[in-house]
């Protein structure tokens, strides 16, 4: 038995497995997704990153045939989502917010049910269930009913259920929401292994660390519109700015520091808990010296400072807060 999909639907690593072109979806006068396009490749994790209400789940529902596409087109391993929905459903897995496992059944019973729905032969079904239970370390709780599971155990079962038919494409809709850090990290490891074995993974998330760690490519969306796309490194480089972090000694200093810094570098943010200023700079060395001069002139007592490269957090906040496109 193997974790690879049947040869007739297999996609070579690096080739496009999911293609979305100019997708649009509205609910009455509310536009949920506008002219959205991206590709996801076999053997990679494509992260769809955005705040709550950005259109991530709506996009996933359209790609997995759960919602009709208003306009635009999408294909999954060459199958047209709108014209061939039954065929598409046979080659995808879906886990996350809309997982369909039955809380009154055990993990084994749920997986047996899914295997029968996919018409997997009995012997192969038994082997596959045993393999997945072992691989995802579910042996200790596989015979308990699902409603007794912890959040991490439930999420693990959701992912395993989506893999029962060895799909070449896996959609994960915010799969780690509500998990504790340890369970989240364990699930990240499993998702990474799936991609390494050739699965195309489309992951929606609002966790920046998750997108940064897991995703080979990232699409940032806000209000249903693509704001930026590329690798994490490309997005950080394209932001074309450094961040100057300055720690001050008191709240009084912080207030004066914000006012003074804005004269040199607009867009200053502050953290009263850490007595920290974060100042975006387009000319790091020159502007950082200018900031220190104006802070000194304003009588601000500085305890520490550093100039750093932007993080994915900086990219995300810039693009979703200002409405800017890159």
Which role does the model predict for each range below?
Residues 1-24, 322-326:
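ABC-family P-loop ATPase nucleotide-binding domain
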Residues 2-4, 283-326:
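C-terminal coupling/interaction segments
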Residues 15-20, 25-223, 227-228:
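ABC transporter nucleotide-binding domains
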Residues 89, 133, 160, 236, ...:
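Conserved protein kinase catalytic domain
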Residues 93, 119, 146, 237-240, ...:
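A generic structural signal for secondary-structure junctions
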Residues 137-138, 265-270, 301-306:
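A short linear hydrophobic-aromatic micro-motif
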Residues 189-282:
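ABC transporter nucleotide-binding domain
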